[in-house]
From Swiss-Prot:
Protein name: Arginine repressor
Species lineage: Bacteria, Pseudomonadati, Pseudomonadota, Gammaproteobacteria, Vibrionales
Database matches in HAMAP family: Arg_repressor
Highest taxon above the source species: Bacteria
Keywords in alphabetical order: Amino-acid biosynthesis, Arginine biosynthesis, Cytoplasm, DNA-binding, Repressor, Transcription, Transcription regulation
Organism: Aliivibrio fischeri (strain ATCC 700601 / ES114) (Vibrio fischeri)
Cited function: Regulates arginine biosynthesis genes.
Gene Ontology CC: cytoplasm
Gene: argR
């Protein structure tokens, strides 16, 4: 099995463990992963994974402090496609606005900026999770909206 496949299996199992909301310490998570066949896992790797996926400690139904994934899984991963990061696209008579998962706006804005004037994009401004797109003079905002929706396979 290739390293990439092993990593994907590890991530899948890690997320499943956190969804169970039974593990209160990193050591317990290490033990659970080892029981699932990931012998090379250690506490520092688990700590990095908890940070990477935005895991938090919270109280479960039994009022125990446990690790879990936040409800909003907007943290982009290496395998995330850009269309998965787009939450909403809308427009008014001046701009097209894209709402993304937290932290994804800069990445998507860079792609849009690279398309440039040939695609009717005069400029792009991005924050953490919101992008404003201004059309060029020769294109209507509704046309730009349609082309952006097509680009991200977004249906209204």
């Amino acid at each position: 099995m290739r390293n990439n496949e092993k990593q994907e299996l590890l991530v899948k199992e890690f997320k499943a463990i956190l969804k169970a909301e039974r593990f209160g310490s990193q050591g317990e998570i290490v033990d659970a992963l080892r029981q699932s066949g990931f012998d090379n896992i250690n506490q520092s790797k688990v700590s990095r994974m908890l940070t990477k996926f935005g895991a938090v400690r919270t109280r479960n139904a039994k009022m125990e402090m446990v690790y879990c994934l936040p409800v909003e899984l907007g943290v982009p991963t290496v395998s995330s496609s850009l269309r998965e990061l787009v939450m909403d696209i809308d427009y008014n008579n001046a701009l097209v606005v894209i709402h993304t998962g937290p932290g994804a706006a800069q990445l998507i804005a860079r792609l849009l900026d690279s398309l440039g004037k040939a695609e009717g994009i005069l400029g792009v401004v991005a924050g953490d999770d919101t992008i404003f797109i201004t059309p060029t003079r020769n294109i209507e905002v509704a046309e730009l909206f349609d082309s952006v929706c097509d680009l991200f396979e977004y249906s209204v």
